[in-house]
């Protein structure tokens, strides 16, 4: 009957390399897995609707992440300093990507953004110097409706966003 992984539940468990979470889980709380530096994979259950601040911060061995459609918001610093994270797919349910979500994810090269995103905040990709490929699940017109913070993309080398009906050049 586990519905939530609470604040600091596994924080700093540096030997934790994998964990199986029940499908009924709905919430990953503040820093729930922060500092689990050996955690290599984590499957977010399909019922999770909220991932709180810093939930996976400094999980230095995570290499990829798929965020299910059930998640509605990526709060501040969720994946900050996940230095091995190279690929992320954000589900269509996420509407907001908050500051520092992927900050200092220096290995991040590929990002897929769901069509439900309405806001991308400043410093989401702070020091993401390897991010070359951004794909958006919606159209070019939908992309242009997203509220993009000034300089949201200042630290990334990607020059275009690949949309379902063509590319949008980034400023």
Predicted features along the sequence, with ranges:
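Consensus positions within tandem repeat domains that build extended binding/scaffold surfaces
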Residues: 6-11, 29-34, 52-55, 75-78, ...
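Short, conserved catalytic or adaptor-binding loops enriched in Gly and charged residues
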Residues: 149-160
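A structural signal for leucine-rich repeat
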Residues: 126, 146-151
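Structural signature of tandem-repeat unit edges
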Residues: 1-4, 13-27, 37-50, 60-73, ...
């Amino acid at each position: 009957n586990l519905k939530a992984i609470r604040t600091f539940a596994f924080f700093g468990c540096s030997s934790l390399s994998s964990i199986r979470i029940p499908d009924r889980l709905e919430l990953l709380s503040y820093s729930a897995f922060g500092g689990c530096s050996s955690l290599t994979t984590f499957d977010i259950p399909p019922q999770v609707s909220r991932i709180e601040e810093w939930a996976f911060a400094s999980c230095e061995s995570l290499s990829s992440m798929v965020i299910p459609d059930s998640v509605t918001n990526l709060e501040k610093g969720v994946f900050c300093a996940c230095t091995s994270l190279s690929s992320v797919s954000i589900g269509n349910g996420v509407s907001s990507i908050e500051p520092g979500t992927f900050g200092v994810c220096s290995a991040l090269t590929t990002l897929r953004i769901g069509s439900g995103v309405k806001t991308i905040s400043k410093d989401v990709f702070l020091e993401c110097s390897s991010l070359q490929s951004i794909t958006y699940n919606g159209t070019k017109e939908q992309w242009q409706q997203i509220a993009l913070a000034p300089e949201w993309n200042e630290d990334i080398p990607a020059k275009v966003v690949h949309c379902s009906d063509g590319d949008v050049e980034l400023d």
